[in-house]
Design a protein with these regions (language model features):
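Intrinsically disordered, low-complexity regulatory segments
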Residues: 2-134, 148
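C-terminal or mid-to-C-terminal helical accessory/interaction module adjacent to the motor/catalytic core
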Residues: 62, 107-185
C-alpha cells in the first residue's frame, strides 16, 4: 500500500526506492479463457488500474541492482510478489539482478531491517495455494452461478466455500426439524 511504502521509505532512507504495487497486479483472463480445463494452466492479464504502478516499478527496476519484494506475508502477498517477478522476467528486467522476497510481521524499523538482512526466495508452495484458491473460485463460482441463473433463478450463486457451508446449514436445519423432544425424569 502507498502508506506502507511511505513508512518503509522513511525507515530505509535514500539507498532504497520503495514503491507500492497497489495489491494484485494481474487477474485471470475473463470468461472461459482464464483456465485451460485440459491442463489447468492459468492465463493472466494486467489489471488496467495498476498499469501505471507497474510502469513505475519497471522504471525503478531498470535503475536498480537488486529487487526486494515486500508484499504481505500471506499466500495472496506471495502471489503478488510472484506476479511482479513474472512481469519483470517477461520484460527481461531481472537478468543479472538479484530478486528476493522480504517478509515482516510488523512495520517497525527493526522488523524491516531484519527482513532486508534475511531475504528469501518466493515461496512457490504459497503461490500454488493462492492459485488453487483462485482457480476454484473461478471454476466453481464464476461458472456455476450463471448456470444457476439460467436453470433455476437469476441471482442465485454458488462458490467453493459458500456451497458446502450452505449444505451444512441445511443438513442441520433438517436435523432440528426432525428432532422429537421428549420429557425425561
Amino acid at each position: 500500500s502507498p502508506s506502507k511504502a511511505k513508512t518503509l521509505n522513511k525507515y530505509l532512507g535514500k539507498d532504497y526506492e520503495v514503491l507500492a504495487s497497489y495489491g494484485h497486479v494481474r487477474n485471470l483472463l475473463s470468461k472461459s479463457q482464464g483456465i485451460n480445463t485440459e491442463n489447468f494452466k492459468m492465463r493472466y492479464e494486467l489489471i488496467d488500474r495498476n498499469k501505471k504502478h507497474i510502469d513505475a516499478i519497471i522504471k525503478a527496476v531498470k535503475k536498480s541492482d537488486e529487487i526486494l519484494l515486500a508484499t504481505d506475508p500471506d499466500r495472496e502477498g506471495e502471489a503478488i510478489a510472484w506476479h511482479l517477478a513474472e512481469i519483470l522476467n517477461e520484460k527481461n528486467l531481472i537478468k543479472n539482478k538479484s530478486i528476493r522476497r522480504v517478509v515482516f510481521q510488523e512495520i517497525t524499523k527493526s522488523a524491516i531491517i531484519e527482513a532486508i538482512q534475511n531475504p528469501r526466495d518466493i515461496a512457490i508452495p504459497l503461490v500454488y495455494a493462492q492459485q488453487s484458491r483462485q482457480a476454484l473460485d473461478y471454476l466453481i463460482g464464476f461458472n456455476l452461478s450463471p448456470l444457476l441463473w439460467k436453470k433455476i433463478r437469476y441471482g442465485l450463486s454458488a462458490g467453493r466455500v459458500q456451497s458446502p457451508a450452505l449444505r451444512l446449514i441445511v443438513e442441520r436445519e433438517i436435523e432440528i426439524e426432525k428432532f422429537d423432544s421428549k420429557e425425561y425424569w
